[in-house]
């Protein structure tokens, strides 16, 4: 860790200001890579385009600072004051922001790939078009934040408060949103494929993600059961049906049409049993029904007859 005195830091900031104001003609870009700046008072500092990757920023005051387009990758931001800071376009790749205060900060277009944001104050933060892929946001308060167009693939958002957040057109593929509060959130246009939304609160949320099976009418479906048999089902017109964020669907009743092996051939078996409940039988010609069907579509693994619209999907499951 590179130690920096207050005098050295002031000189670096002065030269950096000249570099910024002259568009790189005068002065020198601030090179604070690996520097120990813990406890420094940098309120309102202009660090646009500076290099601070791997820097130690414990308890640094960066309130109202301009850190746009700054390299902050792998930096340690524990307990840092970043209220109203401008971090637009900044590189925060795998940065540790544990217990920092980012109230009203601007992180639009910032790269937060793999960043740790545990116990961070993120009220009213602007994450518009930010890259938060694989970021750890577990249990954070993101109420009223702007996450429109953000990349949240594989992000950990379990137990997160996203009340009234703008998540429109965001990419949430494979994100973990179990037990999250999404009440009054705007999820219009969001990519929710394979997102885990188990036990999340969607009261008042704006969401237009379609289910993976026909919403009306009867149709043919398939499911894999015990001993790797494929059951062909007729989902009747009056069956309740839903899906969460994958191709797997659920319904409350269906008629068994046929039972075949994985290769599509029949060995004469007319009754097979569920993989998850060996007392639940599927017999050709009979109607099976689940009385305690869970109408919450986001509880993908909950009660119901699980199925796929195509036979190939059932075979591969």
Language model region names:
Residues 1-39, 43-44, 48-49, 53-84, ...:
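Intrinsic low-complexity/IDR segments
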């Amino acid at each position: 860790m590179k130690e920096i005195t207050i005098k050295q830091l002031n000189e670096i900031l002065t030269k950096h200001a000249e570099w910024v104001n002259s568009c790189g003609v005068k002065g020198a870009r601030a090179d604070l890579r690996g520097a120990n700046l813990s406890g420094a008072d940098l309120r309102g500092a202009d660090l646009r385009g500076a290099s601070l990757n791997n820097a130690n920023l414990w308890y640094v005051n960066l309130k109202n600072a301009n850190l746009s387009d700054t390299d902050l990758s792998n930096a340690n931001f524990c307990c840092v004051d970043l209220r109203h800071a401008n971090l637009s376009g900044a590189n925060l790749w795998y940065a540790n922001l544990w217990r920092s205060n980012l109230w009203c900060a601007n992180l639009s277009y910032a790269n937060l790939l793999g960043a740790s944001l545990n116990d961070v104050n993120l009220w009213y933060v602007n994450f518009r078009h930010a890259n938060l892929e694989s970021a750890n946001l577990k249990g954070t308060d993101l109420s009223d934040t702007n996450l429109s167009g953000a990349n949240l693939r594989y992000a950990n958002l379990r137990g997160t408060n996203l009340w009234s957040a703008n998540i429109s057109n965001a990419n949430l593929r494979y994100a973990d949103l179990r037990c999250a509060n999404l009440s009054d959130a705007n999820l219009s246009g969001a990519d929710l494929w394979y997102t885990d939304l188990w036990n999340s609160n969607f009261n008042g949320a704006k969401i237009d993600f379609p289910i993976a099976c026909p919403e009306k009418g009867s149709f043919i479906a398939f499911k894999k059961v015990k001993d790797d048999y494929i059951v062909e089902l007729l989902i009747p017109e009056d069956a309740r049906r839903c899906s969460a964020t994958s191709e797997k669907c659920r319904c409350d009743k269906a008629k068994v049409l046929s039972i075949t092996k994985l290769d599509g051939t029949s060995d004469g078996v007319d009754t097979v049993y569920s993989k998850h409940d060996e007392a639940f039988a599927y017999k050709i010609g009979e109607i099976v029904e689940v009385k305690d069907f869970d109408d919450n579509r986001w509880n993908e693994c909950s009660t119901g007859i699980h199925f796929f619209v195509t036979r190939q999907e059932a075979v591969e499951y």
